[in-house]
Amino acid sequence: MSNPELSSEKKASLVETLKNKLQALAEQHVDVLESLAPVVRKRVDVLIEIQSQHDELEAKFLEEKSALEAKYHKLYGPLYSKRSEIVSGVLEVEGETEEREEKGVPDFWLKAMKNNEILAEEIHESDEEALKYLKDIKWCRIDDLKGFKFEFFFDTNPFFKNQVLTKTYHMIDEDDEPILEKAIGTEIEWHPGNCLTQEVLTKESLESTKPITKTEEYESFFNFFSPPQVPEDDAKIDENTVEELQNQMERDYDIASTLRDKIIPHAVSWFTGEAVQDEDYGASWVDDEEDDDDEYSDEEA
């Protein structure tokens, strides 16, 4: 399994770096307070106390929200199961009597995901044939409701042996906010010659009897199951590497959030394209609001 979890040494190093940054921010915070006039400082102190009370309420809200989401996720379960049976052709809808060779709803999940802008960028033409065998996607909470896990169910196919591909996100609490600790994906057992994520190229060597092999990496949706990894060599973790790794992990989490919060609960709307229209309308409404604000500002000026 691919695992971006940091070693204890790297964790300690990163924690120390974060502590230093937090210390610098704290010192900056103190400088701001000390620069205030005494009477203003008293008012700000009261505002800080109000904010503290707000944060306590917000923490309770997030706790209750998480429990409520878990409750309704269980209630959604039977609906998702029935949807899966119809999509895969296990269950026929009432009133359908005509015998047909085609079962279920072909390419349901492939089309649903391709209609989403974020996921469409991850799905390449070479992925599509394999994703036609995808018959269901599920997710569930883990780690006391903090983390979550995906399960991708596939029919028997010529690409890989796995019937189920999983991706697990382990989260930790950081100032009452869930922070990604690590992500673990299934190691895909590709059938020979059908790997979509990489290819081993071989050519003869002029200097040796042994052939030269080179692994060519390919862009693929199935790289989702191989989360970004931290280099083993600490010397390679420079500022650019850290920034690139952070961008990769943020992108990976965006994909996961899209699957969890949009695609799975509203799959048929993404399949038909209705969800795309709703998102486009929402984006258009925001743009219109911003344009109105700009016009208002110009008139004032």
Curated annotation (Swiss-Prot):
The terms describing its cellular component in GO are: cytoplasm; nucleus
Annotated InterPro entries: NAP-like_sf, NAP_family
Molecular function (GO) terms for this protein are: histone binding
Domain of life where this protein originates: Eukaryota
* Motif interval(s): Nuclear export signal: 36-51
Q: Return the Pfam families for the record.
A: NAP (PF00956)
Q: Which PANTHER family does the annotation name?
A: TESTIS-SPECIFIC Y-ENCODED PROTEIN
Put simply, this protein is called Nucleosome assembly protein 1;3
This chain is encoded by the gene named NAP1;3
